[in-house]
């Protein structure tokens, strides 16, 4: 992991968090998956064993280099990683008529933005697995997504830092 890359610092709870995200997605091996705000690619790499293909997008170039290296070192061939703004990436994918079956999104504390979410909705994933570290921006983004036809099916908090107010939340939305 490069010094400028983000990674969860609590490995025990991180494993629980990511396994819950994979469980919520209920992948069968046939899905096309996008891992947005993918960091070093951990969620996408885990999902790759349960999906047909995974595309990861991340703004931080060091994290993308780490994701590519992680895929290579683990001999994972059904994953591609791209460096760029997630909203712009999704907008371009939607404009080209691309679709996906499952979207994993793990945005920074500021949450996602309307450009990203509108493009995601246009691409029409059956399931969105949203991982959030900020309940306020999660509520804001869920409001947007539910107005666009998605329903919240499951919510699971994961305590990453005991005895603090910080919590990660995994949410499953579907149409």
What residue ranges belong to the model's regions?
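Rossmann-like S-adenosyl-L-methionine
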Residues: 1-175
